[in-house]
């Protein structure tokens, strides 16, 4: 799809777009009556009217199609059109970043999305440019522009907009990141985190809150603490933030105030927030009926503020538009929209065979890398230092790589010193501290990745990763799939995990099994220094998001040291390692538990002559099933051991796969050994009771051999 300029409006999907060039009220007068009409001539004003009508007519057509049973869902923008078109006239998708929310139809059309393309999404067609039929309608996205795939979770877009703005600032690009939502979404913490980050760094972000006073059925007074229910008033403490509360049903006021906001942003003084008071003339969505919670009187008052009727009245009053001309335009637009819908309806449907495509990168990059090209032969190194060295090497190799997180800059260099020296070497533009806000870390990283950078972020403890889960699951891991391969966010998420350090409930958690449920996310869990370096370097080079689990108890353990690999050493994802060969039983494990299994296996061999094969899976996703199955078919017995809880632990998934594929080869039950299903206590006595001990592992392996 070709790029579309936002300063152009569409007469029809087949015609070229006509430019609307505001004159700021100077010199340009209407040819009909000599009046200065807010700096716009007749053609410009008619083009603006056509775009508003295009959005309105499209909404109504979509709802009629739904009633006919041809579609399933729609969210209307009716009542929001004036401010949306005013914004669209001043934002360029070839240059600026756009994060329009689902009700931002007018802005999307101004960005160059055609009515036919909107209907391709409505009908969930294969040629839908936003998602290929994978997402709900009006979840915008355009390839070859700067309008990335948008999603349903309200508020996740704000931090991504901050990320693209930060990327622009780091690259020295002068542009604006536009992001919108309704007023209800401003109750989300990520909105406040985004305004905070943008204001603190004076980033070029234009926040537009389209306040129609209802979040589905919840009125604004139940959402917002600002004076008179105002979001702009609520944000008054951000001193670098330009704030304006405007009548979003008035095109001219909207245009002027958006212009002022963009001028402020481009001056470098900070971000801007426009609160546009609009009206919601249709129910929240096709699944809602606002007559159940709004009075007829209130709905009538909103109708009296209809932005299109206000604009048409202005044009008629100033002799720009006659009744006959208006009727003709309405008919032309209706025909255009009907024809667009007809063309979209006839487009091909998605193929069922493609449903699993584009979960991960399919470019062949991963497969082309030269893995484990030589044996690690350097000086012995502890795991935390191997991670540090990998980051240094990859930062030197890739100037688009950025590292940030809590306390990661020098002089601290991370609470475990994994990032020590990086900010000194590469500067605080590329290696920097983030706010203490995990959602911010991931959301901003997603935006930076959309802008073509390679963010490698640190989450200080796995126990505190949960505020970022929305960003990781619904944005990072879903971006490529939901956009049908148009966009991706290959963020690397480094996170310290695991117990055995007397960390108590909130410094000891394992998180891998929960994240293994997230499609589109690779998960690494190295157990030694060489693998940690090789896997991390691979994560930094591939085009897929990676959760990189680093066990705190292995950072400086002598038994997890390795000869340091060189700078070209890469370890493939999905390739397990047999750390000890054997023939009596297979042990499948990872992390600290792998080492306890290894030492238990050595002891069993020394004491009883038992031959135990120990497999370190190295990556949770993808899982090397082939190596596991081959071993089980040889030994005929298997036990899966990990530190996470037994119930819901990843060992259950491994056991199920073995049962499905190797059942006829088994001479005993598939055993699992894991932590008790309780939180991890602080007391060493209690912690050692909860987590699997080396003696328990020794006994578990021995019992299965002797079964």
Task: List the predicted regions and their residue ranges.
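Cofactor-binding active-site loop characterized by glycine-rich and histidine/acidic residues
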Residues: 57, 64-203, 208, 219-238, ...
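Glycine-rich ThDP/TPP pyrophosphate-binding loop and its adjacent helix/strand module
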Residues: 146-338, 346, 516-636, 640-641
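Conserved acidic/glycine
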Residues: 1-83, 89-90, 276, 282, ...
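Alpha-helix C-terminal capping segments
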Residues: 85-94, 162-173, 195-201, 236-238, ...
